[in-house]
From Swiss-Prot:
Taxonomic path: Bacteria, Bacillati, Actinomycetota, Actinomycetes, Micrococcales
Record keywords, A-Z: ATP-binding, Cytoplasm, Magnesium, Metal-binding, Nucleotide-binding, One-carbon metabolism, Potassium, Transferase
Function in brief: Catalyzes the formation of S-adenosylmethionine (AdoMet) from methionine and ATP. The overall synthetic reaction is composed of two sequential steps, AdoMet formation and the subsequent tripolyphosphate hydrolysis which occurs prior to release of AdoMet from the enzyme.
Catalytic activity line of the entry: L-methionine + ATP + H2O = S-adenosyl-L-methionine + phosphate + diphosphate
GO cellular component: cytoplasm
Name of the featured protein: S-adenosylmethionine synthase
Residue numbers spanned by region Disordered: 106-126
Assembly behavior: Homotetramer; dimer of dimers.
Residues that coordinate or bind ATP: 16, 176-178, 248-249, 257, 263-264, 280, 284
Gene name for this UniProt entry: metK
Organism, as annotated: Clavibacter sepedonicus (Clavibacter michiganensis subsp. sepedonicus)
Length: 403
């Protein structure tokens, strides 16, 4: 097979320093929403050797024990002793949390439409967007869950790497790790696994030869086999497998690298297959359209591709701070549209209410569901709480598009 185009995406495990921070921020958000569903939060976390610092803005009627949440999450990930380089029980935890700016709150609590007298009687007109910005959603027919194949496989490898560590199947593994998958495409069709890169932290008791053999046997091959079982047909016979290509990886986690919330936005979304508006997700309550509108755009794109409007679809929405109605909606079908793109835009407008309050209500986002999103991808996992993955607007879109 010749003339394949190679596309690569990466993922990281829950023990990667940046992902530790995302999970801490979202665990704090979940605790706040459990006590007060109307909580406003923007929680940022930094981890480094022996220290966690939590900062940001929170407005809530509840109370949460942030240091305890931090320690519990770190231990759950697997950093529970100095032997692995970080210990949730003994690390330092500092907290600097203030209230949300009243200048921001005024635009969310009372929208531009409400203040200017142009609001309708619809309650969804009363809440403005929490910031200006642009958000993208994407879907394709690469996989049964309508995700690009490279990021889908990278996430499954990272999940499997964590699973065999937690189960004790590969007891020498430690929490930090990264995966990367390069897929060969013939036109728009994925054909081959070209390269898999997997780097995993480990204890000193295992040789690199044994680690590479066992990671291939217990992680890589099972993931590729599982993909085949759900109809993803790929030729991996000539795939290059690079497992810990630098050699030993004993120093990892916050001892090896500092971590920050929001530094894995491409891992969190589509692995580079789609554009990104720049806003991170974790630690933000759903009044922040960086998060809620990105979830809505995934919902839109997935339903539109499932409805047969296009085989690949990227959608963009844009907001002005304090304004309820979006200021822009754009679609790109990359030459795969089955109806004109202007008709796709009209069908989306007819089918989806993209005002922030409507998104929050339709997707039921004022719930403590966010820690689960913070590792292995916000999209493409059809879990019960991931309402943005539901294919519940397919018939409506087909009708609106005249299919």
């Amino acid at each position: 097979m010749t003339d394949l185009r190679l596309f690569t995406s990466e993922s990281v495990t829950e023990g990667h320093p940046d992902k530790i921070c995302d999970q801490i921020s979202d665990s704090i958000l979940d605790a706040l929403l459990t006590q007060d569903p109307s909580s406003r939060a923007a929680v940022e976390t930094l981890v480094t050797t022996g220290l966690v610092h939590v900062a940001g803005e929170v407005t809530t009627s509840g109370y949460v024990d942030i240091p305890q949440i931090v320690r519990d999450r770190i231990r759950d990930i697997g950093y529970d002793s100095s032997e692995v380089g970080f210990d949730g029980s003994n690390c330092g935890v500092t907290v600097s949390i203030g209230a949300q700016s009243p200048d921001i709150a005024q635009g969310v609590d009372r929208s531009y439409e409400s203040r200017s007298g142009s609001a309708s009687t619809d309650a969804h007109d009363l809440q403005g967007a929490g910031d200006q910005g642009l958000m993208f959603g994407y879907a394709s027919r690469d996989t049964p869950v309508f995700m690009p194949l490279p990021i889908y496989l990278a996430h499954r490898l990272a999940e499997r790497l964590a699973a065999v560590r937690h189960s004790g199947e590969l007891s020498y593994l430690r929490p930090d790790g990264k995966t990367q998958v390069t897929i060969g495409y013939e036109g728009l069709v994925p054909r081959t696994v070209d390269t898999v890169v997997l780097s995993t932290q480990h204890g000193p008791q295992v040789s690199q030869e044994d680690l590479r053999r066992e990671v291939e046997e217990h992680v890589i091959r099972p993931v590729l086999a599982a993909a085949a079982e759900i109809g993803i047909e790929l030729d991996s016979r000539d795939a290059t497998l690079l497992i810990n290509p630098t050699g030993k990886f004993e120093i990892g986690g916050p001892k090896g690298d500092a971590g920050l919330t929001g530094r894995k936005i491409i891992v969190d979304t589509y692995g580079g297959f789609s554009r990104h508006g720049g806003g991170a997700f974790s630690g933000k309550d759903p009044s922040k359209v960086d998060r809620s509108a990105a979830y809505a755009m995934r919902w839109v794109a997935k339903n539109a591709v499932a409805a047969g409007l296009a085989d690949r679809l990227e959608v963009q929405v844009a907001y002005a701070i304090g304004k309820a109605a979006p200021v822009g909606l754009y679609v790109e079908a990359f030459g795969t549209a089955h109806v004109p793109e202007d008709r796709i835009v009209r069908a989306i407008r007819e089918t989806f209410d993209l005002r922030p309050a409507a998104i929050v209500e339709r997707l039921d986002l004022l719930r403590p569901i966010y820690a689960e999103t913070a590792a292995y991808g916000h999209f493409g996992r059809e879990l019960p709480d991931f309402t943005w993955e539901a294919l519940d607007r397919v018939a409506d879109l087909q009708s609106a598009a005249g299919l």
